Amino acid sequence: MKIFAIQLQPLDDKNARKQIEQLKPFVSFEKRAAAERFRFLIDARRTLLGEVLIRHIIHEMYALPMEQIIFETEGNGKPVVRQIPSFHFNLSHSGDWVVGAVDDAPVGIDIEEIKPIDLAIAERFFSADEYQDLLSQPAERQEAYFFHLWSMKEAFIKLTGKGISYGLSSFTARLSEDGQATLRLPDHEAPCVVQTYSLDPAYQMAVCTRKPAAAEHVEILTCENMLSRLNNV
């Protein structure tokens, strides 16, 4: 497994549009069209960078020309690479970060920006144990803890490829005092490992895999770094 993260730097509208135009040649027509529909430039940047990141990783790992990489969608909506059925990947973005995980087995990744939220949402979407864990945290830690649990749950759901219909309250994410992350799953689910990462103090990130362990290292890139790599392809 490999995990990558790209941090977007603040740009004024002129330079943001310039960066978007620099990224467009490296993505599919469908992704370009999707980026053009976004109201906010940062959403377009994140969307384009996600696909560019995966295409570049595939190019480096398999020497497959970026323009020949074809993405298809499985019945559950999860994207796959037509030419490399054994290649699994997942993307997530929030705020200033775009993150991706790749492996030879299904993988899920999620990143969440810690921001003010009505914690009552946890009573609706969390299991009873998760909700009680959240309420037991000191008031000043509850928002961060909420996003810890949310990122773990999202990473698992993205691993399964079943989407939000899986039922967020049907399984339980736990985070021990020493930072050990675990999932208690329904009986029909195979065991999996979830790991959290301290990528940025303002964010929570988690990766989920059915392998014995997740990657320990996250390779951090910048948009400028990625564009430099692309220009050398």
From Swiss-Prot:
GO terms for MF: holo-[acyl-carrier-protein] synthase activity; magnesium ion binding
Any one biological process term the GO annotation gives: antibiotic biosynthetic process
One GO CC annotation: cytosol
Gene3D superfamilies recorded: 4'-phosphopantetheinyl transferase domain
Cofactor: Mg(2+)
EC primary class: transferase
EC number: 2.7.8.-
Pfam families named among the record's database cross-references: AASDHPPT_N, ACPS
Residue numbers spanned by region Peptidyl carrier protein binding: 161-192
Keyword annotations from UniProtKB, A to Z: Antibiotic biosynthesis, Magnesium, Metal-binding, Transferase
Reactions it catalyzes: apo-[peptidyl-carrier protein] + CoA = holo-[peptidyl-carrier protein] + adenosine 3',5'-bisphosphate + H(+)
Free-text function comment from the UniProt entry: Probably activates the peptidyl carrier protein (PCP) domains of surfactin synthetase by transferring the 4'-phosphopantetheinyl moiety of coenzyme A (CoA) to a serine residue. Required for the production of the lipopeptide antibiotic, surfactin.
Family designation: Belongs to the P-Pant transferase superfamily. Gsp/Sfp/HetI/AcpT family.
Stated name of the protein: 4'-phosphopantetheinyl transferase psf-1
